[in-house]
Amino acid sequence: MSIIKKFLNLFKSGSGEEEEARLRAQKERYESFLKALTEGDLDARWAAVRSVGDLGEPFIEPLIQGLKDEYWIIRRGSADTLGKIGAPAVAPLINALDNPGEEVRQETIRALQLIGEPSVAPLVHATKNGHPFIRRGAVQALGIMGEERAVATIIESLKVADAGVRHEGAVALGRIGDPRAVAPLIEGLNDPKEQVRLSAMATLCSIGEPAIDPLIRALIDTNEDVCRRAGLSLVTIGESSVEPLIRALGDQNPGIRRGATEVLGQIGNTRAITPIIGALDDQERLVRIEAVKALAALGVPAIAPLMQVFREGDTRMRTGAMEALWMLGQPATTPLIMVLKDDQSDVRKRAALLLGEIGDQKAVDHLTGLLSDENVAVRREAFEALEMIKKRTTA
């Protein structure tokens, strides 16, 4: 049936000459609107778009064409009018998602969003059965609508062959924010397409707290790229990740402890200093190495606690503290100078060694004073430190 016949059928009532005259008038009205929509100038098209909403279904196809108009105001007006028409416009709008033009797709999705509930089931169906562009648009629309009932369907879209659909699926899940998406999104961190990996990361970050513990477990994924992206996601989540990561320092799995230590250093929250210092005594060497790097990354606030370990810790912890202080460099010079007069000769010796490694000219006079220390090992270390600083100065 032609769209003119559809239009006229809406107005049939009674019979006779009056009826025929009325139908002719309506036909002329329809044809004038149709001509304005398809052939008129900007003002005529805009007036027609605003006028045809109450006339309904016969104008759906011309309005669908209006979504492709060169002028934004016509595209927006067509979308608004299609939204008013409602359920009869859903199927044509879903088919219109096949258009690759982003501006057209945006207004098409807007119309479906305005229609609301009647569009949900057809959109869910379209995520499974349409052309890739239609599937992408359907997933995108469900995400924009925040449709929680579609979460399971959108999760399935993360597994399809088309990378564009997978990307839109990850983005849509971020808009909805349902924790059920966390595990599939972590799998998405290993997607072969960078765009999908980035959107999966962004969505995990936007989901926030419900994603933290699964991301921490992902720090020991067999795929190093997944581990790295999980760590970056935790860093991006930031403050909310700190306490769970601190708890993870006590995990039985050394890979978890190592990853948590590294991420805490990258986040840079000073609450983590004391727990990370505790990790300097970890049984696993790789955990201790990450603790040293994390403490150095935490900067000046870590110096005072490190100096305490430097003076009082056991051998393994002192070694880690020394490495961290060396990595911190010149900011550690003054605290180390202060312990050159410590009662313990071993503390004086190690402080002299570090000052030589750091190479700060400020330490020269204080190290010179150690050349008369009562302990021969301290005197030797002070001499070597002065030689190292001298070489750096003259280099």
Task: For each feature predicted by the language model, list its residue ranges.
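TPR/TPR-like (Sel1-like) alpha-helical repeat modules
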Residues: T368-E374
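Structural detector for internal amphipathic alpha-helices that build alpha-solenoid repeat scaffolds
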Residues: K6-A25, L42-E57, Q65, I73-A87, ...
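An edge-strand/N-cap motif at the start of beta-rich repeat modules
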Residues: R29-L37
